[in-house]
């Protein structure tokens, strides 16, 4: 005779195993350091607010596709870790945490440094199963540390997407009059005449972005530069393209 209780339990187990193998397991990793509070014009969103809105849209898409999604937020330390789940009620938890993240960031405004590489290693060591890791950051840290952290995920067979958020002014450097620049993380101030080093700044900025692009490409990491005047659908389409390739 068949032990129906054992059969039912086994059946549920195999269904669960199948779902875990076919559905994606994703983690949204958000940099909330003080440099992410920057915006050059009131018409642009601060980088963090843009990133939070992007993360909320991604979480919604993932839950709708019955993918599990988790969240890690950090500045110079881990601020929040929420394991991945795929149930509809989990979306409310994630959105609530993203709302809190913005509120805390506005209260702090300045003085929060960043340790991107360390935070990536922390998450890589916690993930036991392969999945998709989505980093949302301005990458304002030592490139060596950031890239080593990203490669840690690839070594463990995770797929990785990097949304590199930049304010348009950080790329074009439109400043012409004497300006006081403030480092939002260290709070150091520099009063200077921008035209004296604008060309050098642009060269270094171009080289910095190019390095991220090249090394990410070499390690099959999807690198997407997103300036905060870019419509969200551009970034979301890149995610959907990646999601389609994984199935």
Language model features with spans:
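Membrane-proximal, non-transmembrane interaction regions of membrane/secretory-pathway proteins
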Residues: 1-12
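Exposed, interaction-prone extracellular/peripheral surfaces
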Residues: 6, 15-56, 60-247
């Amino acid at each position: 005779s068949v032990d129906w209780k054992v059969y039912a339990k086994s059946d549920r187990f195999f269904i669960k195993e199948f779902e875990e193998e076919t559905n994606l397991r994703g983690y949204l990793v958000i940099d909330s350091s003080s440099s992410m509070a920057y915006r050059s014009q009131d018409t642009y969103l601060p980088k963090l607010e843009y990133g939070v809105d992007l993360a909320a849209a991604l979480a919604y898409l993932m839950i709708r596709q019955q993918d599990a999604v988790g969240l890690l937020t950090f500045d110079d330390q881990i601020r929040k870790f929420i394991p991945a789940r795929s149930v509809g009620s989990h979306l409310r938890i994630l959105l609530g945490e993203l709302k809190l993240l913005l509120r805390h960031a506005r209260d702090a405004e300045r003085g929060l440094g960043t340790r991107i590489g360390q935070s990536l290693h922390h998450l890589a060591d916690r993930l036991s199963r392969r999945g998709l890791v989505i980093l949302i950051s301005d990458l304002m840290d030592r490139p060596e540390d950031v890239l080593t952290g990203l490669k840690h995920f690839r070594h463990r067979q995770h797929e990785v997407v990097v949304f590199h958020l930049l304010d348009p002014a950080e790329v074009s450097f439109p400043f012409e009059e004497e300006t006081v620049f403030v480092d939002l993380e260290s709070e150091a101030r520099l009063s200077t005449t921008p035209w004296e080093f604008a060309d050098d700044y642009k060269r270094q900025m171009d080289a910095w972005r190019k390095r991220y692009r090249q090394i990410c490409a070499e390690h099959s990491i999807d690198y997407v530069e997103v300036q905060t005047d870019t419509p969200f659908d551009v970034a979301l389409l890149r995610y959907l393209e990646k999601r389609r390739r994984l199935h």
